[in-house]
């Protein structure tokens, strides 16, 4: 019985140390702090430390190291959703069918690229998208 207790204690210690290591990896990454953890903490109205702990508990080590790539994908995906809403693409394409899905996808992609890759101000990139939509809608 003593051996089983020791094994359980070793397992608990391993889990605790593993969690601490993952927390340190995540905390030390300035990009993740600024672009992932702080915004999520603000959105959920919880402490940044709590967000980091959630990530550390839910992810394995490999996923912790890959978070930067996931964050970049998330940034583009979330921005695409914002563009959809700001330009009404979901209405015009998905519900009313006034613009083909492929055209809406292209407009969204161009706005996101202009903003993220070419560093245009969001409103300017959005205006370009708006002009593309108007042109498509007025075509006969």
Swiss-Prot record:
It comes from Methanocaldococcus jannaschii (strain ATCC 43067 / DSM 2661 / JAL-1 / JCM 10045 / NBRC 100440) (Methanococcus jannaschii). Pfam families: DUF1959 (PF09218). This is Uncharacterized protein MJ0517. The lineage of its organism: Archaea, Methanobacteriati, Methanobacteriota, Methanomada group, Methanococci. Gene3D superfamilies: EhaM-like.
């Amino acid at each position: 019985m003593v051996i089983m207790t020791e094994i359980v204690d070793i397992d608990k210690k391993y889990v605790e140390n593993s969690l601490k290591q993952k927390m340190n990896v995540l905390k030390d990454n300035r990009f993740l702090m600024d672009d992932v953890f702080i915004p999520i903490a603000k959105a959920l109205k919880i402490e940044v430390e709590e967000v980091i702990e959630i990530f550390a508990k839910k992810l394995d080590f490999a996923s912790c190291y890959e978070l930067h790539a996931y964050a970049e994908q998330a940034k583009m995906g979330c921005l695409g959703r914002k563009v959809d809403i700001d330009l009404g693409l979901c209405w015009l394409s998905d519900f009313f069918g006034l613009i083909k899905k492929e055209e809406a996808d292209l407009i969204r992609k161009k706005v996101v690229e202009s903003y993220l890759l070419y560093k245009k101000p969001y409103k300017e990139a959005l205006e370009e998208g708006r002009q593309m939509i108007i042109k498509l809608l007025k075509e006969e």
